[in-house]
Amino acid sequence: MSEQQAFRDAMSRLGAAVNIVTTDGPAGMAGFTASAVCSVTDSPPTLLVCLNRNASVWPVFQANGQLCVNTLAAGHEALSGLFGGKTPMEERFAAARWRRGVTGSPQLDGAVVSFDCRVEQVVPVSTHDVLLCRVLEISRNDDTHGLVWFDRRYHALSRPVCGLAS
């Protein structure tokens, strides 16, 4: 087994939220499914998003300089598939309801949370760009259950029975 395949297999065991990352601006509207998204800091609120430079959406995200990370809820599996494949952009966005955040990037109605961001810095790493994104607006939906990708499958999350004290 190659080192690359061993790494991919190991990463399949690392559960992650499923997100649709969207943008709209001078270069047009685009979106893709991503699990390579995480918090960087809360001062100021910043996320990182990893985007393959060979992806068809890369030039649009690069030119627009803004995006929205929409964390998917249970029941969004088909939508994730649309945004993760070669489906034409119009069909992707036609499959759900959207609103606009402060940047104008599409925010998914029914998402667990949407982070509307301005891209502050781009760090190239091998085949990908790491986008450091300043969060400008957060829209939460506390009535939904999360969706994670683990072991190359979707898993719906339910509300915890108990949690840690704040």
Swiss-Prot record:
Keywords: Flavoprotein, FMN, NAD, Oxidoreductase. The keyword Oxidoreductase applies. The keyword Hydrolase does not apply. InterPro entries: Flavin_Rdtase-like_dom, NADH-dep_flavin_reductase, RutF, Split_barrel_FMN-bd. Its EC number is 1.5.1.42. It comes from the Bacteria. One of its GO terms (biological process) is uracil catabolic process. One of its GO terms (molecular function) is FMN reductase [NAD(P)H] activity. Catalyzes the reduction of FMN to FMNH2 which is used to reduce pyrimidine by RutA via the Rut pathway. Belongs to the non-flavoprotein flavin reductase family. RutF subfamily. HAMAP family: RutF. This is FMN reductase (NADH) RutF. It comes from Cronobacter sakazakii (strain ATCC BAA-894) (Enterobacter sakazakii). The gene is rutF.
